[in-house]
Amino acid sequence: MWKVASSGRGILKTYVQDHDEDLYRRGMYTFIKRTVPPPTMLMFDASPRDICEVTRHSTNTPLQALIMLNDPTVLEAARVLADQLLKEQTSTEGKIQKSYRLILGRRASSEEIAIMVNYHSKQLEYFGNSSEQAEQFIAIGEYPMEEIKDKVELAALMQIVHTIYNLEEAITKT
């Protein structure tokens, strides 16, 4: 898409992803071609760069769900938060409660905690039976990781955080 809609020559010929510190800059420093904005931004109702918009329309579409489930940015954010939570000496319930506070800005209900604890145990079982899957899952993204003691636990907690990121409340209201 980038190549077809661009002039097809020079440095704008192809999109080149940044790395290291440049990869984690604020969105306002993202290079955007006026004729071809990043598709993810379009899916989440970012205003076009060729006109000024006073209000922004808010939609909720299947493509947004697809992006939230598969985009390396979201998965990497889930991994980094899960890694931070693992360093804390709290119970699984405490880690889930903290992730709700950090992502949604509210405390999780006892029912939500019970559902997530159950899901966490299923993910522990799944990744415990498939350590290769756990390693592939936590390898998404470029953010450096320290030595990981328990890859299965990190992958399971990453799934919990990723699930919270994918709640409608997280996507459209925060």
Regions found by a protein language model. Give the residues of each.
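An acidic, gly/pro-interrupted, aromatic-rich
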Residues: 1-95, 143-174
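C-terminal structured "cap/appendage" subdomains that terminate the fold
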Residues: 86-157
